[in-house]
From Swiss-Prot:
InterPro entries: Anticodon-bd_dom_sf, Nuc_rcpt_coact/corep. One of its GO terms (molecular function) is chromatin binding. Nuclear receptor coregulator that can have both coactivator and corepressor functions. Interacts with nuclear receptors for steroids (ESR1 and ESR2) independently of the steroid binding domain (AF-2) of the ESR receptors, and with the orphan nuclear receptor NR1D2. Involved in the coactivation of nuclear steroid receptors (ER) as well as the corepression of MYC in response to 17-beta-estradiol (E2). This is Nuclear receptor coactivator 5. It comes from the Eukaryota. The modification Phosphoserine is found at S9, S21, S29, S34, S96, S116, S126, S143, S151, S378, S381. Its main location: nucleus. Residues 1-158 are annotated as: Transcription repression. The modification N-acetylmethionine is found at M1. It comes from Mus musculus. The modification Phosphothreonine is found at T3, T274. Residues 395-420, 446-460 have a biased composition (Low complexity). A motif (LXXLL motif) lies at residues 345-349. GO terms for biological process: glucose homeostasis; insulin receptor signaling pathway; negative regulation of insulin receptor signaling pathway.
Length: 579
């Protein structure tokens, strides 16, 4: 057939398009198809042509060719509508179910960041940390600037010099923190040692076994323990004394009786952990038991105590560092000291930028905490010592001078715990004889109590009673109705005057007198003021009658025996004795 086509068919395309050489502007990105992999038969454009093939502007073919399926309106057109069915290259070896964005940094490692195909795409590189100051200020004015992206704390440009200064500041703070920690640890350790209760309390039931109890205390002391010697009286039971010792914090208590002295034994009570009581143990076995449990006590309790001391010291050191940072040193500048997150919020607030309610609350809470730290810095660095009553003094006062009608209380402080003028033990029988003789001879000076209203003042009772007895020799059979307030005033003044040489005190001379017990009981329970006393109470009336009968005689007797007492001695109840 000689029928010639109206238009010759196109010839085979060159591997490098119609140019003389390969286009040098083509890159080797895996996103765009490589020219080496393009099929040479371009007649099947739907299947064999690269979907990402971009027409070269130097292609000089006739754009009116109907068989050229690429759009001639834009030489940069990526694909036509039929190619939108699958936007990936069939030669792409990735899984067809993988729909990750090809702009992911993993797939963008070979792309030039200056490529204009995606100018809005921004890579998150590490070089953003090394911005210049002018770049930072320019970006801060940008409305799309991410304020949480850069940790710029305001101490200088975030460059190598700023990092070196920050490292030096951190090293300096660490050295200062270590120094403060050691100092606070030693101070808190000394405070804990001063407030630590005794390790073992030796309770002596009878005073006849004092020597044996002291020998046991010395052996316990040789184990490295602090020992306290406690003498019981007949008015307090042993269980109450042990409860008081346990409440005071002592881990061990040893009870000594006459039977223990005879058999050279003792009763060991272990207070910490599970309470234990080992009765009538031989002295050697008791020392072994106490030593073994004391080591366990030190390992358990002292380790916890050391952890508590370390925690308090670390907290105080951190608070001191924060206070110093808030004050700011000359090398840190005026804006230094704020945390980076808070500093960025403060900068935004200073620039009148928008802050959310949560960010505003952060700034308010930070400023409130800083104000509290400044207020605390004005006070002492160390908290006040914990008020703890000495075990020996509290137990002694409660065990010796407390009447039988009152229960034993560890926190009770009685007036007899303070040193009061007391007669020597050798003159107790003589004083008792004088008191009985005065009682039997009648109320010789009973009227002196009503005629001396100056007793309630600051003068001493010795001079008042002697003056009243010499100026008014007349006798009155019984006290009138207006005398109880005066007598109560005398008792109140005696409590107010305190331990003066010659003033009678409650629990006088440490004697368990049957006539003085109600008076001492009411005096220890009644407040200083006499306005709140119920005089209709029978016990109050009985105590007042006892004071009326015995008050002047006792005061006169004290004035006579005051010269015999060389120096004020501690009462029998003050038994605290540390080895």
């Amino acid at each position: 057939m000689n029928t010639a086509p109206s238009r010759p068919s196109p010839t085979r395309r060159d591997p490098y398009s119609f140019g003389d050489s390969r286009d040098t502007r083509r890159d080797r990105s895996p996103i765009r198809g490589s020219p080496r992999r393009e099929p040479r038969d371009g007649r099947n454009g739907r299947d064999a042509r690269d979907s990402r093939d971009i027409r070269d502007p130097r292609d000089l073919r006739d754009r009116r060719d109907s068989r050229d399926i690429r759009d001639h309106r834009d030489s940069r057109s990526v694909r036509e509508a039929r190619d939108l069915r699958d936007f990936r290259d069939f030669r792409d070896l990735r899984d067809s179910r993988d729909f990750r964005d090809h702009r992911d940094p993993v797939y963008d490692r070979y792309r030039d960041i200056r490529d204009s195909r995606d100018p809005l795409y921004r890579r998150e590189g590490s070089y953003d940390r090394y911005l210049r100051v002018d770049d930072y200020c320019r970006r801060k004015d940008d409305s799309y600037f991410d304020r949480y992206r850069d940790s710029f704390d305001g101490r200088g440009p975030p460059g190598p010099e700023s990092q070196s200064r920050a490292k030096e500041r951190l090293k300096r703070e660490e050295r200062r923190r270590e120094e403060l920690y050691r100092r606070y640890f030693e101070e808190i350790q000394r405070r804990f040692d001063a407030e630590r209760p005794v390790d073992c309390s030796v309770i002596v039931v009878n005073k006849q076994t004092k020597d044996y109890a002291e020998s046991v205390g010395r052996k316990v002391r040789d184990l490295g323990m602090v020992v306290d010697l406690i003498f019981l009286n007949t008015e307090v039971s042993l269980s109450q004394a042990l409860e008081d010792v346990s409440r005071g914090g002592s881990p061990f208590a040893i009870v000594i009786t006459q039977q223990h002295q005879i058999h050279r034994s003792c009763t060991v009570n272990i207070m910490f952990g599970t309470p234990q009581e080992h009765r009538n143990m031989p002295q050697a076995d008791a020392m072994v038991l106490v030593a073994r449990n004391y080591e366990r006590y030190k390992n358990d309790c002292r380790e916890k105590e050391r952890e508590e001391i370390a925690r308090q010291a670390a907290k105080m050191a951190n608070d001191a560092i924060l206070q110093e940072r808030d004050r700011g040193g000359p090398e840190e500048g005026g804006r230094g000291g704020h945390p980076p997150a808070i500093q960025s919020l403060i900068n935004l607030l200073a620039d009148n930028r928008y802050l959310t309610a949560e960010e505003t609350d952060k700034i308010i809470n930070y400023l409130r905490e800083r104000k509290e730290r400044l207020l605390r810095s004005s006070a002492d660095s160390l908290p006040g010592p914990i008020s703890r009553q000495p075990l020996g003094a509290a137990s002694g006062s409660s065990l010796k001078s407390q009447p039988s009608s009152q229960p034993l209380q560890s926190g009770q402080v009685l007036p007899s715990a303070t040193p009061t003028p007391a007669a020597p033990p050798t003159s107790q029988q003589e004083l008792q004889a004088k008191i009985l003789s005065l009682f039997n001879s009648g109320a010789v000076a009973a009227n002196s109590s009503s005629a001396s209203p100056s007793v309630a003042t600051g003068s001493s009772q010795n001079q008042n009673f002697s003056t009243a007895a010499n100026s008014q020799p007349q006798q009155r059979p019984q006290a009138s109705g207006n005398q109880p307030p005066n007598i109560v005033g005398q008792a109140g003044s005696a409590r107010n005057m305190g331990p003066r040489p010659g003033a009678p005190s409650q629990g006088l001379f440490g004697q368990p007198s049957s006539r003085l017990a109600p008076a001492s009981t009411m005096a220890s329970q009644r407040p200083v003021s006499s306005t709140g006393i119920n005089f209709d109470n029978p016990s109050v009336q009985k105590a007042l009658d006892t004071l009326i009968q015995s008050g002047p005689a006792l005061s006169h007797l004290v004035s006579q025996t005051a010269a015999q007492v060389g120096r004020p001695q501690a009462p029998m109840g003050s038994y605290q004795r540390h080895y």
